[in-house]
């Protein structure tokens, strides 16, 4: 079963339910509502094994673990190498050391996320890396849209960034990079969220005819195949799952040179200086103007994506869960 604090049902919940997974939705408008503590407790006491993701659910579940009389196993996952709470160590470090002590095991989505958490909260003995994974064949075997189907000419270059619009992601730098490139370069944004600030930058750079907002989509494999280059610009990152999806589609990727995502594209994709639109634009142009280099990077990216198969992720979690249930720790 999956319990989501957000009371609003979305397409992902529908997909889970079609796969036979029971999805329970919260009852409050804000996921931070303290009453969620009681809502969660009502459900958690029905289960023997609880796996929490993200703030504030991690806090709520940690508190509930202290209230449970019956022995249960609690696991959480660290999804990022940084968050805003770490800007105030005098306040949050003592709190989070206590929070993470409530968990029997902590998985991190990358080595960078694990190192950052261990340094922050002293979790080294109970943490381990379990990389995210994707259903590779869905992307490898996808049939991409034609350039005409996505509104482009055959000679146009499609650059795609798949990322929700929120503070972690840097959607402005790719816009500025596209503005530095010739007219044939187009940028496609796939993801939900507030696009107002990004649209303002698009207007400021006068590239409204070359930047396309597609919103949340269920056809990402086809869009990935239709693109020429994948980009992920972030201020901080734990993993960068969308980058693996683009690589699995056989497309080269260019990502911010930061912890987490650097680890994912290691030895395959290209890195650009974080926030440097000129560096990003130069790398986009270089790939498209040097076909042999493009093919080499694309091939490396597709090969690298094979390291992030969802089957491997499932196997590693199954091993972890089994060890915890049998009292063998995180081994």
Give, region by region, the residue ranges found by the protein language model:
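N-terminal strand-loop element at the rim of the active site
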Residues: 1-31, 129, 193-195
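Short hydrophobic beta-strand element within catalytic cores of glycosyltransferases
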Residues: 3, 252-255
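Short, structured helix-loop element that forms part of the nucleotide-activated donor/catalytic region
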Residues: 9-17, 118, 186-209, 293
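Acidic anion/phosphate-binding donor-loop and adjacent secondary structure
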Residues: 31, 35, 115-119, 126, ...
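Short His-centered aromatic/hydrophobic patch
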Residues: 52-60, 78
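A conserved mid-protein helix/loop that constitutes part of the nucleotide-sugar donor-binding site
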Residues: 157-180, 196-197, 278
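Aromatic "clamp/platform" in nucleotide-sugar-dependent glycosyltransferases that forms part
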Residues: 216, 235
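Conserved acidic donor-binding segment of nucleotide-sugar-dependent glycosyltransferases
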Residues: 255, 270-277, 286-291
